[in-house]
């Protein structure tokens, strides 16, 4: 169990989880608020 916890705390695994979570959040924001990056003038 200690080896699994050591593996899950390595940088590539944490980076993959972080970027996956960030991508999911951005996708959901764009799903509910589309075209938020375009200023409506």
UniProtKB/Swiss-Prot annotation:
Where can this protein be found?
Plastid, Chloroplast thylakoid membrane
Sorted UniProt keywords: Chloroplast, Membrane, Photosynthesis, Photosystem I, Plastid, Thylakoid, Transmembrane, Transmembrane helix
**Chief location category:** plastid
Q: Which cellular component, as a GO term, is one annotated location?
A: photosystem I
> Which biological process terms from the Gene Ontology are attached to this UniProt entry?
photosynthesis
Q: Which residues cross the membrane?
A: 7-27
Record flagged with keyword Transmembrane: yes
Bilayer disposition of the protein? Single-pass membrane protein
Keyword Transmembrane helix carried by entry: yes
List the InterPro entries hit by this protein, alphabetically: PSI_PsaJ, PSI_PsaJ_sf
Pfam family example for this protein?
Answer: PSI_PsaJ
Task: Tell me which domain of life the UniProt entry assigns to the organism this sequence originates from.
Answer: Eukaryota
Per the entry, what this protein does is: May help in the organization of the PsaE and PsaF subunits.
Give the UniProt family note: Belongs to the PsaJ family.
Return the protein name: Photosystem I reaction center subunit IX
| Annotated source species | Chara vulgaris (Common stonewort)
């Amino acid at each position: 169990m200690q080896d699994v916890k050591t593996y899950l705390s390595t940088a590539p695994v944490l980076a993959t989880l972080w970027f996956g979570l960030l991508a999911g959040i951005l996708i959901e924001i764009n799903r509910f608020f589309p075209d938020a990056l375009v200023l409506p003038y």
